[in-house]
Amino acid sequence: MKKARRSPSRRKGARLWYVGGSQF
């Protein structure tokens, strides 16, 4: 969730770790 602070929603890979970090 630390990387989520960057809010890199513009990146394609961001959605991968963003969703995984939220659930895990």
Curated annotation (Swiss-Prot):
Keywords: Capsid protein, DNA-binding, Host cytoplasm, Viral genome packaging, Viral release from host cell, Virion. GO terms for cellular component: host cell cytoplasm; viral capsid. It is found in: Virion; Host cytoplasm. The keyword Oxidoreductase does not apply. GO terms for molecular function: DNA binding. Interacts with F protein. Mediates ssDNA packaging into virion, it locates to the internal surface of the capsid, thereby displacing the internal scaffolding protein B during virion formation. Protein J binds to and is packaged with the viral ssDNA. Additionally, protein J plays a role in viral attachment efficiency to the host cell. Belongs to the microviridae J protein family. This is DNA-binding protein J.
